[in-house]
Amino acid sequence: MWKLWKFVDFRMTAVGFHIFFALIAFAVHFACISSERFNWLEGAPAAEYYMDENPGIWKRTSYDG
């Protein structure tokens, strides 16, 4: 493996990998924003369907004490 780094610059390879993964992350996030189900900027219509009539009140589920 050490012979590989004689031909390839490690710093440029590391920078290239970071840029590549950042582009993949941006693509995934933009794909989520463009879909109706996973768009967190425009509100969540699926979450509004499941909301309780009093969403600000915490309910105890383990005990009634």
Curated annotation (Swiss-Prot):
Periplasmic compartment spans: 35-65
GO MF annotations, alphabetized: bacteriochlorophyll binding; electron transporter, transferring electrons within the cyclic electron transport pathway of photosynthesis activity; metal ion binding
Gene3D superfamilies: Light-harvesting complex
Top-rank taxon: Bacteria
Membrane topology: Single-pass type II membrane protein
All ranges on the Cytoplasmic side of the membrane: 1-13
Positions bound to a bacteriochlorophyll: 29
InterPro entries cross-referenced by the UniProt entry: Antenna_a/b, Antenna_alpha, Antenna_alpha_CS, Light-harvesting_complex
GO cellular component, one term: plasma membrane
Keyword Magnesium: yes
Pfam families in the record: LHC (PF00556)
Family: Belongs to the antenna complex alpha subunit family.
NCBIfam families assigned to the protein according to its UniProt record, in alphabetical order: pufA_517_ASD (NF040861)
Protein name (record): Light-harvesting protein B800/830/1020 alpha-2 chain
Species of the source: Halorhodospira halochloris (Ectothiorhodospira halochloris)
